Amino acid sequence: MFLRICIGLFIYQQQYFTFATFSFNQPRFRINATWNSNATTFANLSFVGTEPYSIFVNSNNSIYILDINTGQIHIWLNENHLNPTKTISGNLSYPLSLFVTTNGDIYVDNGNNRPVDKWIRENETWISVMNITSRCYGLFVDIYDNLYCSMYHNHRVDKKWSNDITTIVAGTGVQGPQSDMLQNPVGIFVDINLDLYVADFGNHRILLFRLNQRHGITVAGYGSANVTIELFHPTGIVLDGDQHLFIVDQGNDRIIGSDENGFRCIFGCSGSGSTNDKLSYPYAMSFDSYGNIYVTDQDNNRVQKISLSKKSDRKYENCSIFSKSTAKIPFFTFD
């Protein structure tokens, strides 16, 4: 048994520093890490219903899956449980997305009912936290508790700040291919610098919006400045611990990964299907702490677990440190 310690080193210059904790996993991988070519089915139609959308794996490796048909959230405390440990019900109508915070609160898009609702773990009650005009196909809560909603039908991403003010942070509300526009945004991810990544479904690209910038940079897919990889209707975007992109490329029924050598297909690379080496219309993905990938496989009505091929493909445990200053903080891990 090993004790793993994360240490941040810095020189004090009348600035202050904050350790950031995440509710999700951002493992770090060695160059050209691989995942098993055959996945295993973690949850089937009995628990995820038809066409599962959102999934969230927290830092304790608890797994949260939305059933859009019943409006329920199924929770597995760990992958070894065959059946959900807990099921949460509420007045949810066709919910599409969810996000779980470090204290176990759950934000959920309430679909046809329109508001974003929050399930409070402490007293197991529901409250509405964000009024919206269109359902959220992606939800995210950043390290300052700001809430983001990607509106597929409104072609924009809204941000509700912790002071209850809501602003548009990406897109104009009118669909288009320009750098300040979106066409049917879906998955979103906000990094430690509060930079926003958007899976721009209709424009076949991943856009990066730097903090307080309304023009995005195409970092993958159609229109990227550097040759990256061709995407077709991307729906999911997550970052690993080295800020490398992992993309659910729904229209191509595959998952794309990246590292220092660029982009590559890591699963579902031979087309659509229902066998364990294929996906059909995948929607969202989430890492566990070991670097395994969980993905909602919509047309197959299942959630698949794609295991990292070798433990040695993972560098070391996550150590997330955030600085209020612009200075870089080196950090190390020791076994």
Region annotations inferred by a language model:
Residues 22, 42-71:
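Beta-strand-rich domains and repeat architectures in extracellular enzymes and scaffolds
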Residues 64-67, 107-109, 148-150, 197-199, ...:
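Residue position within the beta-strands of beta-propeller blades
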Residues 48-60, 91-106, 132-147, 178-195, ...:
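Beta-rich, blade/repeat-based domains predominating
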Residues 60, 68, 111, 152, ...:
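Short loop/turn segments immediately following the C-termini of beta-strands
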Residues 13-38:
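Blade/loop signatures of beta-propeller domains
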Residues 280-335:
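Blade-level signature of beta-propeller repeat domains, shared across WD40, Kelch, NHL, RCC1
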Residues 40-46, 82-89, 124-130, 167-178, ...:
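A short beta-strand motif characteristic of beta-propeller blades
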Residues 77-81, 119-124, 160-164, 210-214, ...:
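Short loop/turn segments that connect beta-strands within beta-propeller blades
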